[in-house]
Amino acid sequence: MKILIFCPYYPPHIGGLETHADEFNKYLSQNGIDITVFTPKLPVNAPESEIKYNNVKIIRFPAFEIIPNYPLPKFWSLKFWSLFSQLFKQKFDIVISRTRFFNTSLLALIYAKIKKVRWIHIEHGSDFAQLSSKTKTVIAKFYDYVFGFLIFHFSDQNISISRAVQKFVAKFDKRESPVIYRGLDFESIEKILPDLKIKKEFEKKIIISFVGRLYKWKGVENSIKAIKLLSKDLKEKIVFLIIGDGEDFPHLKKISEKENYIKMLGNLPREKAIGILKISDIYLHSSMPGGGLSTSLLEAMICNCAVIATPNEGADEVIKNNENGILIKRTDTNLAMEQIVHLIKNKQEIKRYSEKSKIDIHNNFNWKKSINLYAEIFKKR
């Protein structure tokens, strides 16, 4: 079987979707499936083409970001059209796209309909995009109603990566959209060493962390405000490490730069981010509605962090309140602050939650199980 995947981003670009897509391809290719990935050449120093895992071919087309974290092909580039047209000379059994609002999903639609190939769309979002300004948010919502509608309606099958995503897809398309959770590459995560340099730098402090793209809907501003509400003596006992970049970075840096217990570390390689998660005590998941299932949340749980989470971005599907973490009912600064205080004052709870969450992730997020579910869908006609 030959599969063509249109992917909005792909490693070495950093993000949860990227690791999801790459690990999906790695484990799917082990079933003897030939995979071609068509993706933006971002970052610009990424190779134009490469082969991974023996039978995963990656083709990167010229692209730019019209706004942060929204890539578009360089339509004026002959190189883009040459690479895209070459795909039409090949025969694929299935076309896959990821996330309806990225331009690559439109490319998948065009290709699948012209070539009359079965098209499976994998959706990662659970709400309309919330951007830094009302104008951008309104434009994004309009785009969703037009192009998102086309993607969901014209695909042959929509797959949701979480139950939250499934509910969102149902707003556009009443066909069944099965939920298939991602797996985690436990072996590669285990090989990454804890960041002992960071641990030594903040010796005797409780390390609180966040990893992810810095969009408004990630709710990191609420986490910063919650940390700021801590009493002076508690602030001296903690450090909050924020790893990631995005359109909210300048704003978040501005509101936190006077606080020496909050560190904005910017974009870091995934291995570095995992190393920091491994020496973190608490992970703050502050998302508003929007994402499907946070990869960073799952990685924090496998790295033995005690999690304080809002129910969004799939957290209420993996966190059982007071069993393997703390689930707060809504995005509320005071509620988050109260739970941070609770864990700082009850360190035995940090240990209990972190141990239970690691077991739960191992049991429920297995790539072999996920790939078997996808394989059953691929067999259908």
Task: Name what the model sees in each region.
Residues 41, 164, 183:
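Carbohydrate-associated surface elements
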Residues 52-53, 60-110, 114, 141-153, ...:
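An amphipathic, basic-hydrophobic alpha-helix
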Residues 267-268, 275-280:
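Short alpha-helical donor nucleotide-sugar binding micro-motif in glycosyltransferases
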Residues 306-309:
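Short hydrophobic beta-strand element within catalytic cores of glycosyltransferases
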